[in-house]
């Protein structure tokens, strides 16, 4: 029997599986489109309504959504896009693929999100956009200040909300902060469509461009094969959309489970004698964390490899977030001649962060077992 101590586990309740099988059969036996049909539109509408945006464009990945977002705002050769370095490769590769230059920005060690102070230092006349990443499902407490700063400087703000479905700040949901936002529905994410992504915005012109670009540049307002711009094939399938519709029905339960697990982890770690050696992210009252990952910062004296080895003995998965930092990935080192020391806070953070398992199949007993094993593993290094 599968143990529940996995870093991520796509979960579909039994009643949703029954519903999905019925709907899949209807598609396969009917005359409906297999791609970009009514279910995609339904998923887009429901998702946009959940987040609070006007428009949604379903794609086949978050990477595609990021590329389309940059193309929609007219990013081109010579432009600069500021990005945090504690993030997945796609945040940077999307910028390069659209011909712009990524400007690597350090993070706030307390949140693992982009530092507003460092961001301001990076702005030049060439800055076209800023991408903020809601790291591990945490919206930066400075997110609204970053939005105001970008508006003041006439810079487009893009949210990489791949981790953060259901997160919010001051009641504003992730995906409804920037000019454009992008979500991931990869199997490891809180909500999955196997492969898939979503672009959200509330500007009609941006929406029309994005809607066209994900469909090879086709003019979606006219009949026939009319192409008014150069796009790519990044369409979402009806099957992916059905998975998304099903998952959205369960999302509140998924989030409740994750927050319960995180609360247990927080309570037990803070009450233990290792609290000075393992510091979970502190979440301000105005923020609802989605907990795609549960991040801990370890004291430099603690060897995270040894902790991982100890947890492995109890079949408990563990991990750390995005190592090495984005700017130190071999591709970017070679292309831009970057060396260690450019973003010292992130470089230190990525040497010391640690993730305990958190997924929607876990229960309180699972969480208690995991955190007790973690505390014991850290105590073993005292």
Give the positions of each predicted feature:
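N-terminal "arm"/small-domain region of PLP-dependent enzymes with the aminotransferase-like
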Residues: 1-33, 357
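Hydrophobic/aromatic ligand-binding patch that stacks against planar heteroaromatic rings
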Residues: 93-95, 149, 173, 239
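Active-site phosphate-binding strand-loop segment of PLP-dependent enzymes
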Residues: 110-193, 198-200, 204-205
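Conserved PLP-anchoring active-site segment centered on the Schiff-base-forming lysine
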Residues: 67-122, 129-131
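Phosphate-binding glycine-rich loop
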Residues: 32-80, 94-97, 104-106, 172
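PLP-dependent aminotransferase class I/II
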Residues: 38-45, 50-56, 117, 129-133, ...
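Helix C-cap/helix->beta junction micro-motif
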Residues: 98, 152-153, 314
